[in-house]
Design a protein with these regions (language model features):
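Bacterial c-di-GMP phosphodiesterase catalytic domain signature
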Residues: 2, 61-64
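Ser/Thr-centric signal marking residues that sit
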Residues: 32, 49, 71
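Conserved non-cysteine loop/helix-boundary elements of the Radical SAM core domain that shape
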Residues: 1-27, 36-56, 75-88
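Histidine- and/or cysteine-centered catalytic micro-motif in compact active-site loops
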Residues: 35-36, 63-67
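Auxiliary Fe-S-binding modules of radical SAM enzymes
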Residues: 59, 66-150
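Short, well-ordered coil/turn segments that N-cap beta-strands
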Residues: 24-30, 56-58, 101-105
Length: 150
């Protein structure tokens, strides 16, 4: 909840839970977006969020936090209040998330695209194919399949 307030999400977790309940009651499948790399979040926070989504949604879209021009996040970043994830850190976290998500959950996206004209950091995210290949390579290297730890 503290991260939600920091990024001005605009609603509490209970609102998400209620929306999920109502949508399920009418047969709608739930796909939840998850931003990875938010300020002050630890690896444990990230994995806890992924586990929660794994229990509540049918699908997930993973998104790296992009620091864009003219945003409060940029101001915080420039003051050194937090650091953007490295490509290696992102790949490691995504692999761990995949390992704990239920096997039946659809993973709709492993990373997103930042507008190159607006993106300040992390610039490595502009090389999307390289990131996806890095995730695939690391999954094979660690012998991870989706749900292996769920």
């Amino acid at each position: 909840e503290s991260t939600a307030r920091l990024i001005n999400r605009g609603y509490e977790l209970s609102c998400y839970d209620e929306a999920v309940r109502r949508l399920r009651n009418i047969g709608v499948e739930i796909i939840t977006h998850m931003i990875i790399g938010l300020p002050y979040e630890t690896k444990e926070d990230i994995l806890s969020t992924a586990e929660y989504i794994g229990k509540t949604a049918n699908g997930i879209k993973l998104q790296l936090m992009h620091i864009l021009k003219n945003t409060k996040l940029l101001e915080m970043y420039e003051k050194g209040e937090f650091k953007a994830l490295t490509e290696k850190e992102y790949i490691e976290i995504v692999c761990e998330i995949i390992s704990i998500l239920p096997r039946e959950m659809v993973i709709h996206r492993l990373t997103g695209d930042g507008n190159p004209d607006e993106l300040i950091a992390p610039l490595w995210s502009l090389r999307k194919l390289q990131v996806l290949n890095g995730i695939n390579h690391r999954l094979k290297e660690l012998d991870i399949i989706q749900g292996i730890k769920s």
